[in-house]
Amino acid sequence: MSVRTLPLLFLNLGGEMLYVLDQRLRAQNIPGDKARKVLNDIISTMFNRKFMDELFKPQELYSKKALRTVYDRLAHASIMRLNQASMDKLYDLMTMAFKYQVLLCPRPKDVLLVTFNHLDAIKGFVQDSPTVIHQVDETFRQLSEVYGKLSEGEFQLIRQTLLNFFQDLHIRVSTFLKDKVQNSNGRFVLPVSGPVPWGTEVPGVIRVFSVKGKEVKKMKFRHGGDYVAAQKEGSFELYGDRVLKLGTNMYSASRPVETHMSATSKNAASRAQENIVPNPLAKEELNFLARLMGGMEIKKPSGPEPGFRLNLFTTDEEEEHAALSRPEELSYEVISIQATQDQQRNEELARIMGEFEITEQLEQNTSKGDDLLAMMDRL
């Protein structure tokens, strides 16, 4: 497992989250000033310098539930609120989109180009905010500094780590189904056409070499695909043509996007039972959340500006039905991390959580001894 995977996972999933939110803000006719504020606040929080410095420290990936909690905080960093079902759908769309992009990367190194495509689009969302654009550019420089010197083998390990993270997710997405890049069981279709990876040849030739490295025989074969040579390599500079289209905004065509659980995902979820089996990484996940969320600077709303609720479904009825029909094992509502043994860490986490300003009313049936992590999930 690569300890350099987390920044790429976080930034690409965050980019997909912003694509979905932008599409839904436009679909629900949210006033332009409010929509811009939401995206600006989320991006500003996401690319906070302290947060990025913590994120780029070498560290292993943790559970999907721990990461989901961070995105839940991020999505609520402004005046917008999402119900549980809409947040579930948002996270499903984010994860399946990036899984597709990782699967189709021509070379392991191209996951960096996918990340740059996301950053390029994110800068477009905040083009009127030079300060936030500077934050994104600083993150680009961090990416170039950290990943620019990695070998092909290290990028391959990063790709394998990402695929392991996504391996049990087979959620059907309407856009993928309509484009025939996903089967009805939620698995993606790998293409047998198009450009081959930069620096490689179109398949169809086998060369045999002697022990001295001299070519002694050449054989041709029918590969059955429709491949072409890559015309040029994508740019890894701050500004440039990425060539690769993976990571660009697939919602720009304003198509409604639906998600459905495949039977494979339901079976995998029933086997997983992440919340029931004691997690040996629980303490590490708590540390991870405390460090990551401690670096986030959630801006408290200034003035009496009212918030609004964003629905990722066509109607409220659809949202309610989705909440009821979602398998319990796939619910991210509670992270079962017990941290009662470490009083100092509990106090630090309580201080961190106190900095988050969420306007929704807390449930009244909570007790004083509730676990801090359960309290965090109800904020």
Curated annotation (Swiss-Prot):
Q: Which cysteines are joined by disulfide bonds?
A: none
Identify the GO cellular component terms for this protein.
Answer: basal plasma membrane; cytoplasm
A molecular function (GO) held by this record is: transmembrane transporter activity
Where does the source fall among the domains of life? Eukaryota
- Predominantly, its location class is membrane
- GO biological process entries: xenobiotic detoxification by transmembrane export across the plasma membrane
Q: In which tissues is it expressed?
A: Predominantly expressed in testis.
Q: Where found, per UniProt?
A: Basal cell membrane
Q: Which InterPro entries match?
A: OSCP1
Q: Which Pfam families match?
A: Oscp1
Q: Which UniProt keywords apply?
A: Cell membrane, Membrane, Transport
Protein task: May be involved in drug clearance in the placenta.
Name of protein: Protein OSCP1
Q: Tell me which species this is from.
A: Mus musculus
Q: Which gene encodes it?
A: Oscp1
